[in-house]
Amino acid sequence: MTVKEIKEILNAEVISGDEKELLSEIKMGCGCDLMSDVLSFIKSNTLLLTGLTNRQVIYTAEIAEIKVICFVRGKKPDKEVIDLAKQKNIILLRTELPMFESCGKLYKAGLIGCSEGE
């Protein structure tokens, strides 16, 4: 599934990332607010859905090779976090949907979870 498709399914706003980056393919998704779980279970090239908007999310994404983060529940990171994501080439999205609904919509549309991936 492309980032653009994810954006459309979640009716999300692009916080950082250009049109070319939105064509990137994402293999699977994960909804999580506990960054230690992200490091334990998530695979590379995964979409992370989270309600956390601090710098730690960006650093965790970098370590886990996550290319896209979508903030749920209308959360918006501050400028410092957005700038850090741009430096690390991490695409940021934002949706008004809660995490459960976001995960459900994406799963229904065919995006698998990390437990189902390779």
Segment roles from a protein language model:
Residues K7-G29:
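An N-cap/entry alpha-helix motif that binds or orients negatively charged groups
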Residues T2-E5, P98:
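Short, structural beta-strand-to-alpha-helix junction motif
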Residues E21-S24, C30-L47, G51-E118:
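Feature captures the catalytic cores and cofactor-binding loops of soluble hydro-lyases/lyases
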